[in-house]
Amino acid sequence: MTIPKMKLTTLSIFALLFTIGCQQNGEKTAAKTTETTTKTTATTKKNILFFGNSLTAGYGLDDASTAGFVGLTQQKIDSLNLPYRCINAGLSGETTAGGNSRIEWVIEQQPVDIFVLELGGNDALRGLKAEESKKNLQGILDKVRTKYPSVKIILSGMEAPRNMGKTYTTAFHNVYLTLAKRNNIALIPFVLEGVGGIAELNQKDGIHPTAEGNKIIAETIWKVLSSLL
């Protein structure tokens, strides 16, 4: 049977439009699937909140987001393809009292799965009472756990300058040991281990670590953090 040319042309156009329509639907489906996958990946990442002072903030570094220990920790996590996002909530000059006042607002901004608390250094430099520092740190821990009962917590220990006297330095050292035991949380005995007091690993002020110093701090933190991931 011979099909008229007009009918043949009509059938050809219909077939072409049908094919294009199928391709477009396939592309839309693929695009939607990719978009959904991307959104799912983003929403399934857990948050690690670093809450501290200028050490956490990366004071004095050219680019704290990459050279600070929080940024370096994120790079380590990404290299291992782990589903975690590091959030830097460091504030230069922060004391434990300031942190205790600020924490509620910070933890309202996003869910917290792992909480790394690094505060106390400014208390020690100012010679504030160790008992008050302990009270403030406990307040922070209580607020975080009340908001997120299943949160995993790391307490970053700090040491007071030796010129504060043995009585004070011992009392300050024991603050972190006591809190870690009381709250059953992970402890980094001294977050500046291998960095504090070493001139070439600190900036001119002798207090804030250089980029190289931050690399060492990141490794110190990783030894404890990695077991919680």
Question: What feature does the model see in each segment?
Answer:
Residues 1-10:
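Bacterial N-terminal signal peptides that target proteins for export
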Residues 55-62, 90-94, 122-124, 159-165:
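Short histidine/acidic/glycine/proline-rich micro-motifs that form metal-
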Residues 75, 100-229:
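Alpha-helical cap/lid subdomain in secreted, periplasmic
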